[in-house]
């Protein structure tokens, strides 16, 4: 049987009587007295197409013994279904069992816990929940590119292997060809001069610094790729490998940055509502009641702006026993962020102008000498979902800040060059793709929105 029709296309058809070839996997089998029903799914949509197999089929007895998970090809006639809840069914005229699956197949017809499904991550895309997750993930990734392409942004592929730690937190995964059982030493430290790159290198924690360089040549750019953090955090929100979206705008200040972030998040919310309806309805029904209402509210609302200092005032007045202290100069925790967005504002809010001592070296210093032009976008139920800043374009102040933080100029000479010649105000932000997916699907663990999660002590598959 050559060619095939996707299940999604067959279900959307309006031409009963048409002959179709369907190829996919058996989700369920019901053997009746005079007929057998197979539910076939090929991943193109949530819904399976029912295939009706009658005893006249030459290999009918083989079909009756077919196992859940088997790969099949079916040629048949599409017809209106008399059963409630389904528009069409396929009356089989020929059925080929391409790849059988026996009773040892782990995904039998029952509900499996997410914890168990993580142990068989190579098979979980075949379930309803994870089929929906990864269809939305794919559609959302395409929407990211479309948003920036429609606005004239250049897509930049920044390096995976790097010699710099953009965030300065020392959370790099080291990349080396040295024999670490007997590493060469110099003054008591590993000597990387004989290594592949002749210096210490690691996996990138962010493409921002390289993105800034391209923004000062192409004006508006974005990166979208994998990033890595050797952070030993075993939480539902942390992974060692994840994807980041990082736009950068030349000739822009903090509020222009915030305006782009608002447009971007609203665009993505509308995209999943308009283009992923079946999967989003599933999440709303099975995973997170009220999800659709919350996503629509973000898409339709105007985002507020609040100073960090004002947020601290609200938190200090709150009649809530926070687990973490609230003081000016301390970073906000998720409980604080959620209180601000849910109780004080009642919707999305940008917190702006944070104390400089809790932010990165590259953020532009404000005139008060105490704060930097940083912003975090907070949304209900999650807290921070986007973080960004205006970058420090003044070479003298950037050098001064690097010295205060003990950051070696020599390793960032190329970054500093961008401030020596033709420097201009610029700004950008970062959005963790998996955090976004968690927000838009209601999935509560980052391990469940990435195909093969990388977390402490786990790098299977």
Curated annotation (Swiss-Prot):
Record's catalysed reaction(s): tRNA(Asn) + L-asparagine + ATP = L-asparaginyl-tRNA(Asn) + AMP + diphosphate + H(+)
GO cellular component terms given for this protein: cytoplasm
Domain of life, per lineage: Bacteria
Protein EC: 6.1.1.22
InterPro entries recorded: Aa-tRNA-synt_II, aa-tRNA-synth_II, aa-tRNA-synth_II/BPL/LPL, Asn-tRNA-ligase, Asp/Asn-tRNA-synth_IIb, NA-bd_OB-fold, NA-bd_OB_tRNA
Pfam families for the chain: tRNA-synt_2, tRNA_anti-codon
Keyword field contains Magnesium: no
An annotated Gene Ontology molecular function: nucleic acid binding
Cellular compartment(s): Cytoplasm
Keywords associated with the record: Aminoacyl-tRNA synthetase, ATP-binding, Cytoplasm, Ligase, Nucleotide-binding, Protein biosynthesis
GO annotation, biological process: asparaginyl-tRNA aminoacylation
Class of this enzyme: ligase
Chief localization: cytoplasm
CDD domains recorded: AsxRS_core, EcAsnRS_like_N
Subunit structure: Homodimer.
Family membership: Belongs to the class-II aminoacyl-tRNA synthetase family.
Family matches, as NCBIfam families: asnS, PRK03932.1
Protein name: Asparagine--tRNA ligase
């Amino acid at each position: 049987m050559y060619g095939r029709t996707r299940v999604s296309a067959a279900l959307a058809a309006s031409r009963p009587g048409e002959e179709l070839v369907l190829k996919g996997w058996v989700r369920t089998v019901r053997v009746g007295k005079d007929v057998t029903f197979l539910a076939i799914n090929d991943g193109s949509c949530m819904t399976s197409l029912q295939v009706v197999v009658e005893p006249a089929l030459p290999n009918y007895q083989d079909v009756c013994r077919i196992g859940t998970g088997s790969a099949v090809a079916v040629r048949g006639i599409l017809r209106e279904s008399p059963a409630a809840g389904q528009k069409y069914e396929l009356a089989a005229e020929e059925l080929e069992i391409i790849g059988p699956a026996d009773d040892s197949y782990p995904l039998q017809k029952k509900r499996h816990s997410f914890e168990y499904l993580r142990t068989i991550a190579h098979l979980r895309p075949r379930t309803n929940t994870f089929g929906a997750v990864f269809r939305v993930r794919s559609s959302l990734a395409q929407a990211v590119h479309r948003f920036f392409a429609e606005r004239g942004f250049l897509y930049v592929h920044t390096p995976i292997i790097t010699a710099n730690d953009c965030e300065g937190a020392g959370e790099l995964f080291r990349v080396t060809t040295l024999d670490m059982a007997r590493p060469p030493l110099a003054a008591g430290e590993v000597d990387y001069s004989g290594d592949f790159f002749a210096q210490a290198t690691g996996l990138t924690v962010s493409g921002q610094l390289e993105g800034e360089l391209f923004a000062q040549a192409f004006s508006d750019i974005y990166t979208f790729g994998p990033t890595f953090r050797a952070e030993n955090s075993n939480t539902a929100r942390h992974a060692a490998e994840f994807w980041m979206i990082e736009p950068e705008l030349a000739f822009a200040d903090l509020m222009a940055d915030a305006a782009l972030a608002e447009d971007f998040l609203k665009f993505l919310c509308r995209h999943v509502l308009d283009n992923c309806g079946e999967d989003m309805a599933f999440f709303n029904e099975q995973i997170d009641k009220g999800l659709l209402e919350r996503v629509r509210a973000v898409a339709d609302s105007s985002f507020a702006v609040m100073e960090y200092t004002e947020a601290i005032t609200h938190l200090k007045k709150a009649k809530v026993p926070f687990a973490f202290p609230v003081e000016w100069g301390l970073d906000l925790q998720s409980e604080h962020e959620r209180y601000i967005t849910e109780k004080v504002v009642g919707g999305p809010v940008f917190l702006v102008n944070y104390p400089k001592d809790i932010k990165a070296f590259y953020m532009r210093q404000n005139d008060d000498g105490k704060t930097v032009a940083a912003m975090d976008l907070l949304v209900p139920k999650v807290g921070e979902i986007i973080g960004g800043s205006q970058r420090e374009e003044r070479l003298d102040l950037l050098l001064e800040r690097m010295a205060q933080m003990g950051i070696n100029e020599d390793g960032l000479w190329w970054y500093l060059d961008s401030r020596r010649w033709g420097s201009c105000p610029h700004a950008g932000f970062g959005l963790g793709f998996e955090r976004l997916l968690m927000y838009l699907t209601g999935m509560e663990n980052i391990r469940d929105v990435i195909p093969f999660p990388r977390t402490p002590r786990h790098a299977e598959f």
